[in-house]
């Protein structure tokens, strides 16, 4: 607990046998667990206990996994450092003076510290991959629709996916095997994962694989990060892969488009937290608007408030076309860029994060710095593509991750390539 990786420690025993029998799993605290607090890292939901399990939780338990706790996170998933949590920041187990990444920082820290064998996070703009990179573990964001979101407390519905965090690529793939597949409770899910065997794909055989390297996702990155990334590419070439330069000009606008869309969706999704149906009460003194305002001012932290306000502004009548519409057009451009690129390459590679893990407290006073750290991860969410972060050594004693992005439902390809980086 010295890392503050868990908000709630508990034991939820799974089935007597199954592929996860004897395996401990930590679950991010925005994934519903019946009768166990699911706070989303917020004062607003500090006492909330869901009346049902998320589909992925049911999958875990049916596979024999044992849930050992609900992990700390940036409030409602809004952050890149796990410092915006109402329950305090999580520390990076590699260096406790630094952030673990976010928003699934508690999940990554728990796995890296050995407090859980595996973990679940959610990834809206990099929230599984960023903490995996910063904590030196593996994090995988599945294709949108591969894993059920039923029971995930929504931040930005069109962007987010639940994904595994593990010490190894094979471990992440094994957990993906358990949670992937269609769900009658989530109309966005597809059949693609029903018969897949992701763990068997982690062979590391990249002979003949073509890897695209976009300059747009290395420009401006820390030199130490780029050095480790280039070394990983050299290792892949030595194993028979080919690397080629590709262009993704749309990625220059990805962060801006992502934040407009995510904040806009958040302003709608979080409207339900008004102190009446959910959340802390506003006291019901005065009129309803005052009551709602009091409840939300008391229940939400600064970053969540900022994003709700910006999202509401972007959707407002006078600015919808200027911001939200243009962001959606940029999103379509990102998707088109990737589609054209995957006509020529099998995977796209970049550093997961452009910088090394910041010191605790460094980003809180400069939210723009925090937003820009998502430059390499947000494009995969905008394009609804699978992406994995795998450790690629360290720089000055701090972990560096390599990100591999694949075409839709190309999880097996990126898992195979990630296994080669890992070796």
Swiss-Prot record:
Domain of life: Archaea
Protein family (similarity comment): Belongs to the amidase family. GatA subfamily.
InterPro entries on file: Amidase, Amidase_CS, Amidase_dom, AS_sf, GatA
Keywords: ATP-binding, Ligase, Nucleotide-binding, Protein biosynthesis
CC per GO annotation: glutamyl-tRNA(Gln) amidotransferase complex
Keyword Cytoplasm: no
Catalytic residues of the enzyme: 28 (charge relay system), 103 (charge relay system), 127 (acyl-ester intermediate)
Protein name: Glutamyl-tRNA(Gln) amidotransferase subunit A
Self-association state and partner proteins as the record states: Heterotrimer of A, B and C subunits.
BP GO annotations: translation
Organism: Halobacterium salinarum (strain ATCC 700922 / JCM 11081 / NRC-1)
Purpose of the protein: Allows the formation of correctly charged Gln-tRNA(Gln) through the transamidation of misacylated Glu-tRNA(Gln) in organisms which lack glutaminyl-tRNA synthetase. The reaction takes place in the presence of glutamine and ATP through an activated gamma-phospho-Glu-tRNA(Gln).
PROSITE patterns: AMIDASES (PS00571)
Enzyme nomenclature, EC number: 6.3.5.7
GO molecular function: ATP binding; glutaminyl-tRNA synthase (glutamine-hydrolyzing) activity
Highest classification ranks of the organism: Archaea, Methanobacteriati, Methanobacteriota, Stenosarchaea group, Halobacteria
Enzyme class: ligase
Pfam family, one: Amidase
Catalytic activity: L-glutamyl-tRNA(Gln) + L-glutamine + ATP + H2O = L-glutaminyl-tRNA(Gln) + L-glutamate + ADP + phosphate + H(+)
Name of the encoding gene: gatA
